[in-house]
Amino acid sequence: MFLAETELITGGVSMYPTLETIRQLAQTKEYRRIPLCRELYADRYTPVEVMRILRKASRHCYLLESASQTEVWGRYSFLGYEPSMEITCTDRTLKIRTTDAEGKTEETVRQVTHPGDTLREIIRKYKTPVMEKMPPFTGGLVGYFSYDYIKYSEPKLKLEDREQQDFRDMDLMLFDQVIVFDHFRQKVLLITGVMTDDLEASYEKAVKKLEEMAQLIRNGEHMEFEPLRLHDQKYEPKFPERKICRDGGESQTLHQRR
């Protein structure tokens, strides 16, 4: 774990690590991405409120909570938006969609034997150090692997009669901007990456990006959602178990797609 000295810039904004620390880490040639963090007080915001702002500002976003087996409440809430890469794989067809800083997108499609080989390349390319004072996740891949993903490791396994659903074998996104609620310290941590290829310019871009993130949280527009309404005439025939529950034949029924 690397020390992250606090640096105060104009206006008393707390950011870390220092540019000198980032230079030292870059000289090791071990990391291509160094996380840069800016702190805000969390007394004015909640994870759900920020999620509504991100949902309005970005096509893709997420909210993940952390909790160990010994905790009732997790220390961290992780949020992210504007992924720089979208990676999906279905039946060995791998699609990668990248988005640059100007919003220009590019998509590649190819056949693969195992998508894990591509994922390992991406992880190596964006290898990030663990920094003191920062949470365990400071950016990276977020998404899911379906049950069907096992077929890439067990090629002899035959998956027959697969339901035609919207689920892909793998659906991941690469997030560089991360917003973390540290509930223990009552702080909001804004995190983005400094790429070591062009360190000085990347550092300046990262500082500007952190300011944009802070302004988005403070002044961003909230997404408004319509309330969910289920009409009895349309949905009741799909749930005949309701009568069975009333009659005492079942205590609970959980409906799911797969």
Where do the PLM segments sit?
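Short acidic (Asp/Glu) patches
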Residues: 115-132, 155-166
